[in-house]
Regions:
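Accessory C-terminal segments flanking Radical SAM cores
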Residues: 136-241
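Conserved glycine-rich "GG(E/T)P / GGGxP" loop and the immediately following alpha-helix
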Residues: 1-158
Length: 241
């Protein structure tokens, strides 16, 4: 999103919601030319919020990393998308860590899907590297159309990867990132959802965070519709493939 649109959204909502954690993700947020300015706007609106940057880590070595440490508390989740590229991500993280010498490293149990592999911590700052074996695909298909499943909302919600993460997108609040993205696409049909605007009943929306709603029926009820994250050919990286 353009920087001015992001600032407008923040200013519209800063007196309406008070997030403990504000996640910034994409796409790839490190591609945004004014990323650290966005950090500043978030902290100006919500001084006590923890900024969480979710990145694939490929561009960390090209960032002015010192600017990241000005916006604590800060977390950075580095998601590994290609096992054969993990050494590149590790190198970029190590370069980032060199800014300070007081990091504590914790190795986390590697069992399970969506686990955290390593965590680096220092006062006000945390980095973790994550691996996700599978992603549940949040739509069905009919020909070239993306259509919703007709699942039991409670069952679908029970396997959701982000069951309590609403999204602020284009100045509106959405239950989750997938529905915000799907409504933006030209080849979708059957998705019935109205996002919340600042003049709507925000309290009612907030009370349903982390709880199943009718829109959750758009996703499958089981991991049978999951995609192997590391399958050959699933993820391509420009200039590295």
């Amino acid at each position: 999103m353009p920087y001015d649109d992001i600032v407008e959204s923040i200013n519209t909502w800063k007196s309406k919601v008070y997030p403990k954690t504000t996640s910034i993700f994409g796409g790839e947020p490190l591609l945004h030319p004014r990323l650290t300015d966005i950090f500043g706007e978030v902290k100006k609106a919500w001084p006590d919020t923890t900024i969480r940057l979710i990145t694939n880590g490929y561009l960390l070595n090209k960032m002015k990393m010192g600017n990241f440490f000005e916006h604590t508390p800060f977390e950075m989740q580095v998601s590994v998308h290609r096992l054969d590229h993990e050494h590149i991500i590790n190198k970029n993280i190590i370069q980032f860590l060199k800014h300070y010498s007081d990091w504590k490293i914790v190795k986390v149990n590697e069992a399970g899907v969506g686990h955290h592999v390593y965590v680096w911590q220092r006062p006000g700052f945390k980095i973790w590297k994550s691996k996700f074996g599978q992603f549940v695909i949040p739509y069905n298909t009919e020909g070239n159309q993306l259509v919703p499943f007709k699942s039991n909302p409670k069952e679908a919600h029970s396997i959701c990867g982000n069951p309590d993460v609403p999204i602020l997108y284009k100045n509106k609040l959405y239950k989750c990132a997938p529905i915000a993205n799907l409504l933006d696409l030209p080849n979708t049909k059957g998705f019935k959802y109205k996002p919340i605007e600042a003049f709507d009943n925000v309290d009612a929306f907030v009370k349903m965070i982390g709880k199943p709603e009718s829109i959750c029926s758009m996703c499958p009820e089981s991991r049978a519709h999951a995609s192997d994250h590391y399958a050959k050919g699933e993820v391509h990286v420009k200039h590295l493939d």
